[in-house]
Amino acid sequence: DTNTFYILCGWMTEKDALAFQKDIQNDEKIFCLMEDQQAHAKKKPPTKLKNPKLFKPFEMYVKMYGLPAYNEMDPTWFVAITYSFIFGAMFGDVGQGLILFLGGLFLYKTKHMDLAGIISCAGVFSVFFGFMYGSFFGFEDVLKAIWLKPMNQMMDVPLVGRLNAVFVIAIGFGMFIILICMIFNIINSIRNKDTEKAWFDSNAVAGLVFYGSIVLTVGL
């Protein structure tokens, strides 16, 4: 008699691997060998994103620009928070934000559309900033602004003069995002044991010190 053997090799998450091992433990015809040491692998492990349900829809954007490597940080949560925050700051309106939230939530629950989930999250931030701005369906005299009126609020900027407050805050927030991204790059370099890149890359420690000093100088 000729015996036929099938050999299957692949990657599994630890949770799935343990479940698979449990399923086949009583099958004498199946022999399973598991290796959890990445150093022995000839190829780099694939990346599987794992995020809370609230951030799941934003994985679409991460996959669009390329998945992080196995040892790198998953930026989904950061993308979700910053995207929703920036959208809300730009489109702050209680009424319209509420429509986006409800419409997005309905489509996400019924059609399971990732984009609808993103719109729903953005709608929540839009409502929040709508209260901050005192805007309701474009009318700014219905609600009292908790924070400021975007079109009228001005502030003094050294060496420049008076500028719109929202414009100045947007620039400051953009600088903050750049600094955070540099920190992420440093963390990824350390995880990949690339010390040279962590210290001397333009988006690592060297760039962080240079850019951070400029930001502090301008701020002071």
Locate the predicted segments by residue.
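Conserved, carboxylate-rich catalytic/transport cores that coordinate ions
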Residues: 18-220
